[in-house]
UniProtKB/Swiss-Prot annotation:
This is Mitochondrial import inner membrane translocase subunit TIM13. Residues 1-18 have a biased composition (Low complexity). It comes from Mycosarcoma maydis. Signal peptide: none annotated. One of its GO terms (molecular function) is metal ion binding. Mitochondrial intermembrane chaperone that participates in the import and insertion of some multi-pass transmembrane proteins into the mitochondrial inner membrane. Also required for the transfer of beta-barrel precursors from the TOM complex to the sorting and assembly machinery (SAM complex) of the outer membrane. Acts as a chaperone-like protein that protects the hydrophobic precursors from aggregation and guide them through the mitochondrial intermembrane space. SUPFAM superfamilies: Tim10-like. Belongs to the small Tim family.
């Protein structure tokens, strides 16, 4: 029985394998979070646009309702993309400013 995994001390090859597993888990968690966020975005957009565009549900959608849903979903996703890219840019700028400030110390 190899106890090196319990002590945290391992051979170089074992360390690489552990690092690879850790990276694979990070990637899987990241992927699952992205999927959950996408599902949440679609659900929210559907709820908002459905309540706005379909006042009285029926057996089928009218042309007006279909057009409204299409436009509403497009605008919702466009707004999400604008907000998301602005947020990412802002966080990136703040990190860069923080790195510059740390380097100056």
């Amino acid at each position: 029985m190899d106890l090196s995994s319990l002590t945290g001390k391992s051979a170089a090859a074992g360390g690489a394998t552990s690092a690879e597993r850790k990276e694979a888990i990070k990637q899987q968690v990241s992927s699952e979070l992205a999927m959950a966020n996408a599902q949440q975005l679609i659900t929210k957009a559907t709820e908002k646009c459905y309540s706005k565009c379909i006042p009285a549900p029926g057996a089928s959608l009218s042309g007006k309702e279909q057009t409204c849903l299409t436009r509403c979903m497009e605008r919702y996703f466009e707004a999400f993309n604008i907000v998301s890219s602005t947020y990412v840019r802002r966080v990136s700028n703040e990190r860069a400013a923080g790195a510059v400030a740390e380097a100056g110390l």
